[in-house]
Amino acid sequence: MDTSDFNFKFLGQSVLRYQVPLDVYNTINHIYETKYPELKPANKQLVGKIEKEHSLFYDGENSNKMTKHNHLPQDILQWFHQKFIHYLEWNKVTEYNTHLNSVWINTMFEHEYNPVHVHQGMLFTGLSSVMILKLPQSFGVEYSSPDQPQNGRLQILGSSSGQFANVDYQPDIKERDF
């Protein structure tokens, strides 16, 4: 079958997975652990049902929920920027502006969760990411489906539809995943 006239347009969103370099991982953990008392709570601007949500970086508009601040060194901010540029280039996005808006840490405990939500940033097409800093030894008893555990799972939902479309992604997460 000749497919020389075939063209392809992906109607979903790509998910790329990186391993965080050890120095970036250690630096972020160290900042969180040593500066925790001075980190601003991020709960007011986040949807999570999580007690300990603290901001490491915010460069959005000042509001009653959050004001600009930065606890991250330039090399860490640059690492995030490089990953977002790689994502855009890998997806063949050629016209874009980048602006790192915020970096925060969620420390989750039993019965806490993040409901399904959308990250949009300043534009409709904002990029989102999740970095795994630490994981517990156990996520507790799986009550409903021990053969397909869901406790502690990250689930990324896509916006595509169709018979063969992938609509969600549940990676087996490890520390240093991004």
PLM features per residue range, with description:
Residues 97-107:
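A short glycine-rich, His/Asp/Glu-containing loop-to-beta-strand
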Residues 106-178:
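Catalytic core of non-heme Fe(II) oxygenases with the double-stranded beta-helix
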Residues 1-96, 111-115:
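Non-heme Fe(II)/2-oxoglutarate
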